[in-house]
Amino acid sequence: MSTVAELANAVVSNADQKDLLRLSWGVLSVDMEGTGLMLMANLFKTSSAARTKFARLGDVSAGKDNSKLRGHSITLMYALQNFIDALDNVDRLKCVVEKFAVNHINRQISADEFGEIVGPLRQTLKARMGSYFDEDTVSAWASLVAVVQAAL
């Protein structure tokens, strides 16, 4: 099993992946709140376990009308922005990932459970990127998710 530092280094060292992450982030971040809500809705559609883990948010089907869900969605997107901003520095990426992981460890989210976000992220990327969507972009994001998984 790879360590956080090893996986962070693999992402930081891969210029092609970093380009794909930054390009797709440019699209995703145009509407931070909307994209975050879409990502969470896609997660809840694909995972009943996720709905259970997020019970504290209340009625997630209310979408934008649920202030707790909105808050989580916005916070999630700014965490992703921190990851993107740290793509050129292994130590910085490791630090922001480990801080992000603490929140999930405290809520008893396992690495495998966290990895379930890749499918909903793929759906979100496809919806947001349209004809610019490709599987290489999903793979780049999956590599970033793997860094978080290693920290859990």
Curated annotation (Swiss-Prot):
Domain of life of the organism encoding this protein: Eukaryota
Keyword Phosphoprotein attributed: no
Keywords: Acetylation, Heme, Iron, Metal-binding, Oxygen transport, Transport
Modified residues (N-acetylserine): 2
CDD domains recorded: Mb-like
Residue stretches making up the Globin domain: 12-152
InterPro entries: Globin (IPR000971), Globin-like_OT (IPR050532), Globin-like_sf (IPR009050), Globin/Proto (IPR012292), Mb-like_M (IPR044399)
Binding of heme b, residues: 72, 104
GO terms assigned for molecular function: heme binding; metal ion binding; oxygen binding; oxygen carrier activity
Keyword Transcription regulation: no
Family, as annotated: Belongs to the globin family.
Stored PANTHER family: BLR2807 PROTEIN, GEO09476P1
Subunit and interaction comment: Heterotetramer of two alpha chains and two beta chains.
Protein name, per record: Globin-1 subunit beta
Source organism of the structure: Anadara trapezia (Sydney cockle)
Lineage, top ranks: Eukaryota, Metazoa, Spiralia, Lophotrochozoa, Mollusca
